[in-house]
A protein has these predicted regions:
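Alpha/beta enzyme core
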Residues: 1-153, 164-170, 174, 204
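Extended, intrinsically disordered, low-complexity segments
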Residues: 160-206
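Active-site loops and adjacent core secondary-structure elements that bind or stabilize anionic groups
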Residues: 156
Length: 206
């Protein structure tokens, strides 16, 4: 199943309706939207200065998305940014509960702390009201078993493939620059045939 990162829903409730319909047409399993204002900024860039969406307005987006879906299994995950914005645990819980009541299939609680303390505190208070999702980009050293013990349903490893690809591309570029040759890198990179295979364009090899 594919869960799409839908940012803030790309606008108002009308945009959210259209987004859900388009995703269902492409067999996407669900979408995660966050309660920040459109257009959004990455949560780790001055997160405490970012404004959050009005709760009722965001609930309206969730309801619009649920009303628009035709597939009963399509999921809307509501991402709570209150901890990122420095608004505290109580506000995060208030928002999470409002989003659950509005029809969210799961709630994602996000944090920029290097320890999972505030996430685990949220999980304890949340008490399995609905599935809970996390993104441990900053508190990556926490064992997955800790998340299981606190009733967390889904862990998203959000950006590590992108970051790994950057490291690999930098190393490849450095090698080519320093050796003025492809000999040292050819065995460490994907073949052209593999690229065609991933694109579903194997006929280009004929």
């Amino acid at each position: 199943p594919i869960l799409l990162d839908g940012d803030t829903g790309y606008g108002d409730f009308n945009n959210m309706r259209r987004l859900v319909r388009k995703l269902e047409q492409r067999d996407i399993a669900g979408v995660c939207i966050e309660d920040k204002l459109f257009p959004k900024t990455n949560s780790f860039i001055q997160g405490e200065r970012q404004e959050l969406e009005d709760v009722q307005t965001f609930c309206g987006k969730i309801q619009a998305g649920k009303d628009a879906q035709h597939d009963d299994d399509f999921c809307i995950v509501a991402r709570v940014e209150a901890l990122i914005a420095g608004w505290g645990l109580d506000e995060a819980l208030r928002r999470g509960e409002a989003y659950r009541e509005a029809g969210a299939d799961a709630v994602l609680i996000h944090s920029k702390q290097s320890r999972p303390d505030e996430i685990l505190a949220f999980a304890r208070e949340w008490a399995n009201r609905c599935p809970l999702v996390i993104v441990p980009t900053k508190y990556y050293a926490t064992p997955t078993e800790v998340f299981r013990e606190h009733g967390i349903s889904l862990v998203i490893w959000a950006n590590h493939l992108v970051r790994a690809s950057i490291t690999a591309m930098q190393a490849t570029a450095r090698s080519i620059f320093e050796t003025e040759s492809l000999v040292d890198v050819e065995g460490r990179v994907a073949t052209v045939a593999e690229i065609f295979r991933l694109q579903g364009a194997d006929e280009l090899l004929e």
